[in-house]
Amino acid sequence: MPKLENKKTKKEAWVVAVDMGYGHQRSAYPLRHLSPQGRVINANSYEGIPQKDRRIWEASKRFYDFISTFRRVPVIGKLAFAIFDRSQRILSFYPSRDLSKPTFQLKQNYNFIKKGWGKDLIEKLKEKPLPLITTFFTPAFMAEFYDYPEEIYCVIPDADISRSWAALNPKKSRIKYFVPNSRTAERLQLYGVSPDNIFLTGFPLPKENIGGEDMAVLKGDFKQRLANLDPQKRYYGTYGEMVKRELGELPSPSRPLTIMFAVGGAGAQKELGVEIVKNLAEKLKSGEVKIILVAGIRKEVRNYFLENLDNPEKVDIIFAKDINSYFGKFNEALRKTDILWTKPSELSFYSALGLPILVAPPI
């Protein structure tokens, strides 16, 4: 994998995401220290973005948010979502075959780029040419089309991907991909990306939840979590020697079993959070269980929780007005979380932090 940092010289890179759902920003957040300003640039809302560029991005975002919530409308909602979902479908992995033919959606993206979409962003980045790391495919395509002079890296925050992630002509593209798993690496090759441009790195996880190279923070949190999840020591009875070798002696449980339910960026499934609280009301009342509901940066989701819970003061609600504050609060709360409950998303990779995950139905 290409190194962006060494002991002698700290190298910098532009880190670019989009604020369309949390996945692209969550995977960029741990890389923000590489940026000259220590922050992530959002390609769809950066300072000074031309109105014509903003309109293209906003049309896409509005449609995504609308279709995610409209799905709950009986019959017609599910039909509309099925049509949308089909346009983004990931073709079956087997049999192995050439899947490099570009989709209509990808061609449409490039048509906008050829008409000037993204040129302003790339010209601004050219003023201080640094390696470009983006967690969304469109800025990578823009950079390549407008001859960005430095390396272009695309971080993939998904366990499997559609053809949209590979360039129009993938065999000639110089975009390099950082992928979270071997399936995604193989998928890119089916789409025509050269194996030389694919690097299996895993998903970027927050440093504050890991610690240094010794992973002291992660191991300490995992020890406490394991004690909470195994109060009768059944797991420890079987794997105790391995636990002691890797983590040391387990502490006694020091908190109620803590469940975090995370709502997606579009605000869908907030009703499930309220249902969870109501079903565990007795255990909440007795102090046996603690629940954390994650509203993210969606004020309407926080308000929904407050208005629909009988005793909202018994529940912790994570909400922030800006994305960085939200990620900070979320990562801090994760350290004292025993079970993460969420829909299939980038948070699935957080199992690597030693977090068991309950998977809600996909949207």
Predicted features and spans:
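Catalytic binding pocket for nucleotide-activated donors in carbohydrate/polymer assembly enzymes
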Residues: 347-363
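Conserved N-terminal ligand/cofactor-binding loop architecture of enzyme catalytic domains
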Residues: 29-120, 296-301, 308, 312-315, ...
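Hydrophobic acceptor-binding patch used for acceptor engagement in glycosyltransferases
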Residues: 339-340, 356
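Gly/lys/ser-thr-rich phosphate-binding loops in alpha/beta enzymes
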Residues: 1-55, 184
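A nucleotide-sugar donor-handling region in carbohydrate enzymes
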Residues: 175-273, 294-299
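A short, Lys/Arg-enriched amphipathic alpha-helix followed by its capping loop at the start of a domain
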Residues: 27-39, 128, 279-287
